[in-house]
């Protein structure tokens, strides 16, 4: 082994295996592109993105960490979201939650 070398086991890596997911249709009604990062709380994304927000509470994009999805002006697409895990508490972003996700409607 070389110092710093990473040895990966054979096979595929499944991201977010067994986690709750939801698909949502999103349209950018703004005049500028909107980019959403992999771990951004989708419920709180830019208001120029038009979609049914209620089902997205506690969800983020189901994409690899460190990546993003870009919505060009006038563009519509369907994205898959995955539920947050762990303590399921959300702080920051636009400040719409600021605490536990459980018990919210």
Curated annotation (Swiss-Prot):
A biological-process GO annotation: urea catabolic process
Cytoplasm is among the record's keywords: yes
A GO MF term: urease activity
Subcellular compartments: Cytoplasm
SUPFAM superfamilies found in the cross-reference section: Urease, beta-subunit
The protein's annotated pathway: Nitrogen metabolism; urea degradation; CO(2) and NH(3) from urea (urease route): step 1/1
Superkingdom, natural source: Bacteria
InterPro entries assigned: Urease_beta-like (IPR002019), Urease_betasu_sf (IPR036461), Urease_subunit (IPR050069)
EC number: 3.5.1.5
Family, as annotated: Belongs to the urease beta subunit family.
Protein name, UniProt field: Urease subunit beta
Source organism: Pseudomonas putida (strain ATCC 47054 / DSM 6125 / CFBP 8728 / NCIMB 11950 / KT2440)
Lineage: Bacteria, Pseudomonadati, Pseudomonadota, Gammaproteobacteria, Pseudomonadales
